[in-house]
Amino acid sequence: MAEAHQAVAFQFTVTPDGVDFRLSREALRHIYLSGINSWKKRLIRIKNGILRGVYPGSPTSWLVVVMATVGSNYCKVDISMGLVDCIQRCLPERYGHFGTPQTEALLSMVIFSTGVWATGIFFFRQTLKLLLSYHGWMFEMHSKTSHATKIWAICVRLLSSRRPMLYSFQTSLPKLPVPSVPATIHRYLDSVRPLLDDEAYYRMETLAKEFQDKTAPRLQKYLVLKSWWATNYVSDWWEEYVYLRSRSPLMVNSNYYAMDFVLIKNTNVQAARLGNAVHAMIMYRRKLDREEIKPVMALGMVPMCSYQMERMFNTTRIPGKETDLLQHLSESRHVAVYHKGRFFKVWLYEGSRLLKPRDLEMQFQRILDDPSPPQPGEEKLAALTAGGRVEWAEARQTFFSSGKNKMSLDAIERAAFFVTLDEDSHCYNPDDETSLSLYGKALLHGNCYNRWFDKSFTLISCKNGLLGLNTEHSWADAPIIGHLWEFVLGTDTFHLGYTETGHCVGEPNTTLPPPQRLPWDIPEQCREAIENSYQVAKALADDVELYCFQFLPFGKGLIKKCRTSPDAFVQIALQLAHFRDKGKFCLTYEASMTRMFREGRTETVRSCTNESAAFVQAMMKGSHKKQDLQDLFRKASEKHQNMYRLAMTGAGIDRHLFCLYIVSKYLGVSSPFLAEVLSEPWSLSTSQIPQFQICMFDPKQYPNHLGAGGGFGPVADDGYGVSYMIAGENTMFFHISSKYSSSETNAQRFGNHIRQALLDIAELFKISKTDS
């Protein structure tokens, strides 16, 4: 096969005349170019490391300081106050021709200038860290900014005015603070008050007070100690104990999905759309490696932590019997592709040159045209990644630790990411309510064996050119993959484009070797393990009810007429909808980010509050005046916004209690309070999907260029998972998941309640689409 010759640099055979070596010049050329490319990347990393290390300074500023010192010395002005002379006296004795007094004086001035420059950088960086520790601006109304906040904003802008690289602010970000135990306990009790009757609340209050007085002080000391030496006192434990140690299937339980633009279509040619998307992703990876991506900034000046972006590509979750492992490679030059039960390896480079979209389209089309059947056991192989983690770890160790199976598995696990060429078509038809839900189901779990759920993300290509992502959760949270996805969709639409016939622009290089088919030798025992995992995954997938819909009456623009945040508006509507659906309040999880702190990930906002419960109960009674309902709504909204701000600034509830629980386990300390808190089910798990993190186009000029967001599976057996995207000024998308096996839940019924709740709250403020 042609690809085999490309992969081998030389061959040799033993003959009666000796050993005959046959060199492949083309293969050696590729190896040489690959080595050159690798060294280029290393040099870029070294350069970026230097530039990042001296931020907010620069090599230019160092040169200015040196020139100022030398110039002042030339003018007989000693700005060093004798330090240059002191440094000169401390230099080793002069040797040879170059050890002249002038040379030593110049060297002393350079050393002095470098010290002054480095001291200035340290001072500016510590000052910036101190400034970024101030979060008072989050709790102020935009129209009532204090003088302190205005001065703070000016100082931050001055210290971060130079164009930053992706990781320039990492060492200037403050550490996540450890809240005080009494504050956390107080906020916890306040959060569960609307969920408990008086007797249950008194019992919980007693447990909390006992914990606060007896057990918590010791646990808190250890946690504070960890916060002093660890970069982030939460993130490593969160990654390990919440994600990597979970033995449940990743599919549905952990992985989540992201949708394509659904209101426009760029092309119907599957291979062409995929060619553009893969090319755009590797362009993004190149920018990531070179740190050319701008860090995400709140208000355009407060940097967010970029740590999670490091493991976006070349990353796989490796199964283990007790805990999984995240394997991240510094480089990968290929993608793994699945189509009709077969696995392929597709190179992304020719030598050191990234393949053009048209070349990638040709490679993917070759796979689509390949008529070869799957090898025995190959078709459902990926079901191992969809089933239990222990079973997959055992099968991997037994059947994939040597030979061609190991080689092929390495090709998948060491790929930049995983690609699947689906045989089904999906699209969003506003007249067909089920179309968006079917598309979401396909992205969430597919047929249980056409996604490699262990990869950092799987790029899914439908037959009609529609795209989607399935993302593993442990390495990063949704805003990170959302940043990549916005870049890909924007680059595909506005920069790469297509010909009139729907193909990628340009002419393909037909001399490229075809994709390499991955060989397998899967014994009968392994096939049984694959089938068992498939049955587990299929039962899980069949039990998921997913209801996705577009809410058309209004969006962010008209919500602002209520003088509240769009997120608070939706969260209160969810509380009203849930009460109408089940007749009771429940523990509600909303994901908030803590990326204003170094290596921060998420915190929980407990959206069911006393204030939101009071509003819901008043709405249910139907006897209150509209003005009273408006007042109750505003109180609930203000409470929600305040809780969200507290969570973002490190004063949340659940991560603190989670870490105290981990410390108690390490110390062997029993805590009935922590055990009960950590076992409480989240019957309503919610998340807002971010958008427009990166400016690729003007949404006002292109209002139909909207993704539909994404979603996840239900967290509790009798609960709902709800994700929503407030997509611009005039519309919203909702993704609701539940389990068919639960008699308490129905995703479509809950979706209808959400629709009505949004309309009812809007009616309180007489908001209609005609008001815009």
Swiss-Prot record:
Cell compartments where the protein resides: Mitochondrion outer membrane
Chain ranges passing through the membrane: 48-73, 103-122
Protein name as it appears in the record: Carnitine O-palmitoyltransferase 1, muscle isoform
Top-rank lineage group of the source organism: Eukaryota
GO molecular function terms noted in the UniProt entry: carnitine O-palmitoyltransferase activity
Gene: Cpt1b
Metabolic or biological pathway: Lipid metabolism; fatty acid beta-oxidation
Active site: H473
One GO cellular component term noted in the UniProt record for this chain: mitochondrion
Membrane-related topology note: Multi-pass membrane protein
Cytoplasmic side stretches: 1-47, 123-772
